């Protein structure tokens, strides 16, 4: 399993995530138990119907202020929250998913954090609003900032609110 990822949403949409997220040992234990139970159940169901059930499973949980953990959803694929793994881990969720569906081994080294100890990696969705052709400005200025990475999704048009990139 990967180190915990925290996230923030606005109006139910992903805005930013960070890894590693810090939780108390009790919260982490609850979260791991819920995630393991959900994924093992889905894999067992897939295998019972002749499927393999391989791949990355993004398990989204809510941690309440009282320390209780609630299940929200499972995505049987890379999840937007996990985009931070492109900056934080030895292998990103995308590379891990490819290895898993190809039946290649995944070790602790593959999911190990690649950032200096005591630091946190973060990603932030770049969301635009409007209608029409996509236009990107100030990319050079953004990339001139040390430690900044930008992933543009190459969506040709904007319709309403749309995630166009992640930094």
Locate predicted features.
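A short beta-turn/loop motif at secondary-structure boundaries
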Residues: 7-8, 62-63, 114-117, 157-159
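Short cationic amphipathic helices and targeting signals
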Residues: 122-124, 164-167
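Glycine-rich phosphate/diphosphate-binding loop of Rossmann-like nucleotide-binding domains
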Residues: 24, 28
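A short, glycine/Asx- and small/polar-enriched loop/turn
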Residues: 64-70, 161-162
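Beta-strand scaffold of nucleotide-dependent catalytic cores
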Residues: 1-7, 16, 59-60, 69-75, ...
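Active-site "cap" helix and flanking loop/linker of ATP-utilizing ligase/carboxylase catalytic domains
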Residues: 29-59, 65, 75-132
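Glycine-rich phosphate-binding loop of ATP-grasp-fold ATP-dependent ligases
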Residues: 1-23, 161-166
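Glycine-rich active-site loop/lid that clamps phosphate-bearing ligands
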Residues: 116, 125-158
